[in-house]
A protein has these predicted regions:
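RNase H-like, Mg2+-dependent phosphodiesterase core
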Residues: 1-206
Length: 206
């Protein structure tokens, strides 16, 4: 029987420490794909080699586990920041640039400020500090995994609040993603103020 070697979630952070960086933040986003709601980004500086049992890619965790870990991360982090870019900003500057804007806002909240950012994915911009991008970073880096959880939990909670405001769309269930139920509601009720109109163009053209 083949056993997978456990991933050292601190590997990228250790490399950064070895290169002379002391304050290293992980950055990730939640909500790039949905048809409604903002994109959320989080930035987290963890104490070196902090062990948080169950810390892994937020997409693989149950909602309950994510929320539990969110409380642990916010309690244990050296610093963390959470920020949004609105659906209007997404429509104005596109989802990639809006994601970078949310990341920039999240990092600006960190005190002390980070010396290096580890960012999930393979694309970045000039954030005014050194950046290292890591593909699938949310399952390879402790700092990015922590940021992923904070972003997802925060955005999910916001979409649950929007569900109370616009109950006909089912935001509490699908969080704004393009499910059958969501498209059916759009056909019946049309869009609401938190829908991303640039994401709905093809839907309405058809």
């Amino acid at each position: 029987m083949k056993h997978e070697t456990p991933i050292d979630l601190w590997l990228y952070e250790k490399e950064a420490f070895a290169d002379g960086f002391q304050l290293v933040c992980g950055v990730d986003e939640a909500g790039r794909g949905p048809l409604a709601g903002p994109v959320c980004a989080a930035a987290v500086i963890l104490p070196p080699e902090l062990v948080i049992p169950g810390l892994n890619d937020s997409k693989k965790l149950t909602d309950k586990k994510r929320r539990e870990l969110c409380s642990v991360i916010t309690a244990e982090a050296v610093s963390y920041g959470i920020a949004f870019a609105s659906e209007q900003e997404i429509d104005e500057i596109n989802i990639l640039q809006a994601t970078f804007l949310a990341m920039e806002r999240a990092m600006a909240q960190l005190a002390p400020p980070p010396e290096l950012a580890l960012i999930d994915g393979n694309r970045s911009k000039d954030f005014g500090l050194p950046v290292r991008t890591i593909v699938k970073g949310d399952s390879l880096s402790a700092s990015i995994a922590a940021a992923s959880i904070l972003a997802k939990v925060t955005r999910d909670r916001l979409m649950e609040q929007y569900d109370e405001q616009y109950p006909q769309y089912g935001f509490a269930v699908h969080k704004g993603y393009g499910t059958k139920r969501h498209y059916a509601a759009l056909r019946e009720y049309g869009p609401c103020p938190i829908h991303r109109m640039t994401f709905l163009k093809k839907f309405y053209e058809n």
